[in-house]
Structures are given as C-alpha cells and as structure tokens.
A protein has these predicted regions:
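Charged, often Cys/His-bearing segments associated with DNA-binding zinc-finger transcription factors
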Residues: 1-37, 142, 179-183
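Basic, low-complexity intrinsically disordered segments
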Residues: 2-5, 20, 32-140, 155
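N-proximal short alpha-helices
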Residues: 3, 7, 56, 84, ...
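Polybasic low-complexity intrinsically disordered regions
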Residues: 88, 97-286
C-alpha cells in the first residue's frame, strides 16, 4: 500500500539530542577529548572574565565558543554567519556545542565579539596545547619525525581595497571606488589593503595574484597529528622561515633527539637546508 505524503508534528517530544547522534560518529570521541581539555582551562576562563565579574549581560560561555570554532574548522564553514545558520538547524552541531533544541542561536556579530576575547587571552593556543598534551600522554607522538607544509589563505579583502599607502580613504571607500587597477604597477612596498593592511598581494606558481596570508603546519609522522601551526604574511620566504621556527620549537621540547623533517621541493633552497641542521635526503615523489 502506498504511503501518504503527510507531515504531522508532535506538540511534545521525549527525544534527546544525544539520541540523534550515531554511537560510532567520530565527533563523540572528539567531544570527550575536547571536554577534558576545556576542564583544564577553567582557571584561564576565570581570569578572562575577571573584569566582568561585577555584573553585566552574560557572555557566550567560552567552552561553547571553542566547540563552535572547532566545528567551523572540521566542517570548513567559511564564515561565522554561515556557522550560526547551520547551528540553527543542525542537531549534530547543537549537541557538540552544548545547545539544547530550544536554545537560541547567537547573532554572528555577538559570536565574533566574544571570540575576540578568546584570541586576546591566547585561549585558542592554550586549548590546542591541552589537546596536544593528551596525545603526548597517550604516546601518539614520536617527537622526532615530522613533516612540514604551507598553504595560502585568501584575505577577506578585494583587489580594489589594495591602493597606494599615501592614498586617503577607508576600506569601504576604496572597495566602492570604480577605478580600474588593471595594467597599473602595484607592489606591497607602495600599496596596501585598506580593508586588511596585514594581507599581502602574492602569487604562487600558476595561481593569480591575490591578497593573502600563509598558513604553516608541522605534523608528527607517527599518527599524522599537527603539533605546531603558524600564520604569517605571504612572501617568498615565509614557508621556510616558519618551518625553521617550528623545528626549533620541536628541538627545544626534545633536545636529545635526532629530528627528521619531510618537506616538498618548495623547501629545497640553500638558505633553508643548511639552517635546518643536516644535509638533505632527496627522494622523488611518484
């Protein structure tokens, strides 16, 4: 017998958010590790809000902020506005963050403002280090064998915001301007973005020139876990400089170890290989 296409919503429900999350879902194991790390950050969170202890409107709980930010990374949600939109209807996201089905979702601007407090107090770095400490306690890290890589991060700024440094006007005016920049000589020495002054006009390989930053990661090869990360301005030396800095950090943690480093051909430069400490062992990738 053919079923009918009807929809009847119950006035009451006895379902819990946990009932909608499969027992084998990877976020279950991740959430346990996340909550253990957040518990160890309680003293930091208390210091962050000492100036607001006398009263005022309650902020977003820092634990919920960090869980939401982690979801944004894991699921590649490109903006806070889209993240809040997904939290509104995604029961998995609500469960992971710690919001009930009845809880209101935060306004994106409020979320961004509260997130800034985390950044100012290095809470994100402390959270990363707490998770890394769990991996170390479980002997998931070799502390000797690493790989390094970098990637381009596009800035939230348009080409029209990239104007001469001595040109007046803010980012909105610059982006709204109708001037055609094509064919004009532009460089980071003479120009900057009025929307994001820290970004740099940069191209790599066959890619087009864009306003960008560079992200860098150091991975422990035993289980493929990221043990260090940096974001820098984009230039031709940033990848190698960041790699040397992260390898130096690894040496300080384990000074007696013989550290090996894997990298692609972009790091095969005479200013990098000798500085890394040993002669290279090259192997062609198939």
């Amino acid at each position: 017998m053919r079923g009918s296409d009807t929809f009847t919503e119950s006035l009451f429900s006895i379902k819990k958010l946990d009932d909608f999350v499969p027992a084998s879902h990877p976020l279950r194991a991740i959430r346990v590790m996340v909550n253990d790390a957040l518990t160890n950050l309680e003293d930091l969170f208390a210091r962050m809000y000492e100036d607001a202890a006398k009263g005022g409107r309650p902020s977003i709980a820092p634990q919920k902020l960090l869980r939401a930010m982690l979801l944004q990374v894991l699921y590649s949600v490109r903006s806070e506005r889209l993240l809040m939109e997904q939290v509104q209807y995604n029961l998995l996201f609500r469960w992971f963050i710690g919001l009930s089905m009845e809880d209101s979702v935060w306004v994106p601007t409020v979320f961004s403002k509260n997130r800034q407090r985390l950044i100012e107090h290095d809470a994100v770095v402390a959270f990363f280090n707490e998770v890394l400490a769990q991996a170390e306690n479980k002997d998931w890290l070799s502390k000797e064998q690493f790989s390094v890589d970098g990637t381009l991060i596009q800035a939230w700024a348009s080409h029209k915001s990239f104007v001469r440094k001595d040109e007046p006007g803010d980012g909105e005016d610059a982006q709204a301007g109708g001037e055609d920049f094509r064919g004009q000589p532009r460089s980071n020495d003479t120009h900057e973005s009025k929307s994001d002054p820290d970004s740099r006009l940069y191209r790599k390989g066959k890619t087009a020139s864009e306003l960008r930053f560079m992200g860098h990661t150091l991975m422990d090869n035993r289980n493929g876990l990221i043990v260090n990360a940096k974001v820098t301005q984009a230039d031709g030396h940033a990848e190698r400089d960041a790699a040397l800095s992260m390898v130096s950090d690894a040496r300080q943690i384990n000074p007696e170890a013989t550290i090996t480093l894997g990298a692609d051909k972009g790091y095969d430069a005479k200013e990098f290989v000798p500085s890394a400490g040993r002669s290279p062992s090259a192997q062609s990738a198939r």
